[in-house]
């Protein structure tokens, strides 16, 4: 299947978006840790965790049926439209710059967890990108699946 310059540019833009989202998260203290109790999370934190779980289940089903295009499209839209365009913007207001509140720490944990899920789900089709993004910062290369 030939790839045109538009498809290559779209793939580059997505990889850049993923890299920048991860960079933002790590610069703001996000990391993979045990999730706090659900009652302690903000509405936005609960929403993105629920959506990430829905996406994970759908992507798993698509991959089990060898429907790679559907899995990738779902991940693309979740990552770009929901995680980056919505949740990251909300997270910017929940993670304070001048001190750490409990809600700010919870948002860091949720952001780290959701990024870890996204990188794991993207890994089968974008292994070089996901390893480059997570190798030095997150747990993808060293944790079992």
Residue positions per predicted region:
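Catalytic adenosine-cofactor/nucleotide-binding cores of aminoacyl-tRNA synthetases and other
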Residues: 1-39
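Short secondary-structure subsegments characteristic of cysteine-rich extracellular domains
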Residues: 6-11, 97-118
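Core structural elements
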Residues: 13-24, 47-54, 73-93
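Structured alpha-helical bundle/scaffold domains in large eukaryotic membrane-trafficking regulators
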Residues: 30-34, 91, 95, 99, ...
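A ubiquitous short alpha-helical element
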Residues: 38-48, 103
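Conserved small/polar residues in nucleotide/adenosyl-binding loops
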Residues: 136-142
């Amino acid at each position: 299947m030939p790839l045109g310059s538009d498809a290559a540019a779209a793939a580059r833009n997505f990889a850049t978006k993923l890299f920048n989202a991860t960079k933002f998260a790590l610069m703001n203290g996000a990391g993979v840790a045990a999730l706090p109790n659900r009652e302690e999370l903000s509405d936005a934190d609960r929403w993105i965790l629920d959506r990430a779980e829905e996406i994970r289940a759908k992507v798993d089903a698509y991959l089990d049926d060898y429907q790679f295009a559907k899995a990738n499209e779902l991940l693309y839209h979740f990552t770009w439209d929901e995680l980056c365009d919505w949740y990251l913007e909300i997270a910017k207001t929940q993670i304070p710059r001048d001190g750490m509140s409990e809600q700010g720490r919870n948002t860091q944990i949720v952001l780290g967890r959701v990024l870890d899920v996204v990188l794991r789900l993207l890994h089968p089709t974008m292994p070089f990108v996901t390893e480059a993004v997570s190798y030095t910062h997150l747990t993808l290369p060293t944790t079992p699946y």
